Amino acid sequence: ELIEDLFEVSKAANGTVVLHPEEVDVVSLLKQVRFELSDKIEASGIQFHFDLPNERLAASLDGQKTCRIFENLLVNITKYGMKGTRAYIKAEKDGEYVQVTLRNISAEELKISPEELTERFVRGDASRNTEGSGLGLAIARSFTEVQGGTMKIEVEGDLFRVILRWQLKDG
């Protein structure tokens, strides 16, 4: 898994990621990933609250890469979130953009800058005994940006928030 992750990050970094953009509904992708990860979510001890609109939020994205972004971010919450707390995942239209916000309470105070968190192999102190390559956020950021989107991380004490934005598809 580490080798595969490294391969993905380096491809994204040097612009050799092959994208298959098509019109995808971001809401449907989030629902699909939520379903695929339902066992992990259930076992995490964290209450996940999904606030998803009934309307489609279509963007021109690579469905597989975008699912990977959502997977990495949701799995991170199950791994590093504090048990007994809630995680909020919201998709919404914001002007000409589709915005997906994920926020949760970290099991440990995050004494690390948002920039450092997306560097390769950087993991918060608390994650030393958690499985993972340390590339989850780096891959999520790379796959977001290579598709013309932005991924912003905000850290405030133990509150962790990720905001993803992509241009909405006209129509």
Task: Please place each PLM-identified region on the residue numbering.
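Conserved glycine-rich
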Residues: 148-149
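Conserved catalytic submotifs in the C-terminal HATPase_c
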Residues: 20-23, 42, 47-57
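Short alpha-helical Gxxx[C/S/T] motif in the catalytic ATP-binding
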Residues: 136, 140
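Short helix-loop "hinge" at the ATP-lid/N-box region of the Bergerat-fold HATPase_c
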Residues: 77-78
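Short beta-strand/loop element within the Bergerat-fold HATPase_c
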Residues: 84-96
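Short conserved segment of the HATPase_c
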Residues: 109-122
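Conserved micro-motifs of the catalytic ATP-binding
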Residues: 14-19, 58-61
